Amino acid sequence: MKHKVGILGGTFDPPHLAHLRMAEEAKKQLGLEKILFLPNKIPPHKHISGMASSDERVEMLQLMIEGIDSFEIDTRELMRTGKSYTYDTMRDMISEQPDTDFYFIIGGDMVEYLPKWYHIDDLVKMVTFVGVNRPSYQTEVPYDIVKINMPETTISSTEIRNNIENASTFLPEKVWSYIKEHQLYGKK
């Protein structure tokens, strides 16, 4: 019997409670053994200035998932030079773990963008995409996507960075403390 592993990729700049809830709900609803958080270095679709360093983002992720044995961090995309493509990462993971079915978890904002992903026609044969509802985004695309139910949330890393003074309620307590201690996103 194959293992069932979820993957939640993103910049995690910063990681927030909606990321945690997405991972928990996907694990529970799909019966996944574990969730791999996959922070990326240079997402092909984003151009971000003022972002936290790779090390800071990994540290915040570690603080967020601390004590949850079935949640892990995979930093392979941070080690790459150039842009990070999910296709390349999944090709490598499948080669390393041929006895595993991978479930790639994406929010509504990414479902809408899915047809533009690099090698998407090959990628949909390699993984099962799991779409999580997000307000104001279309979740209908010409690919098979497993949808999971989750209370809708409007939390986004961009909004947190842009309104850092009022962000504590959207962040795990340890992540909020880290942001304050390291004065990230202009927080003093």
Swiss-Prot record:
Q: Which InterPro entries match?
A: Cyt_trans-like, NadD/NMNAT, Rossmann-like_a/b/a_fold
Cite the GO molecular-function annotations of the record: ATP binding; nicotinate-nucleotide adenylyltransferase activity
CDD domains from the entry?
A: NMNAT
**UniProt entry tagged with the keyword Nucleotide-binding:** yes
Query: Catalyses which reaction?
Result: nicotinate beta-D-ribonucleotide + ATP + H(+) = deamido-NAD(+) + diphosphate
Name its pathway: Cofactor biosynthesis; NAD(+) biosynthesis; deamido-NAD(+) from nicotinate D-ribonucleotide: step 1/1
Pfam families xrefs:
CTP_transf_like
Write the record's keywords in alphabetical order, separated by commas: ATP-binding, NAD, Nucleotide-binding, Nucleotidyltransferase, Pyridine nucleotide biosynthesis, Transferase
Q: Which EC number(s) does UniProt give?
A: 2.7.7.18
Is-annotated flag, keyword DNA repair? no
- Gene3D superfamilies, alphabetized: HUPs
GO annotations under biological process? NAD biosynthetic process
Function field: Catalyzes the reversible adenylation of nicotinate mononucleotide (NaMN) to nicotinic acid adenine dinucleotide (NaAD).
Family indicated by similarity:
Belongs to the NadD family.
**Family annotation (HAMAP family):** NaMN_adenylyltr (MF_00244)
| Annotated protein name in UniProt | Probable nicotinate-nucleotide adenylyltransferase
Q: Which organism is it from?
A: Listeria monocytogenes serotype 4a (strain HCC23)
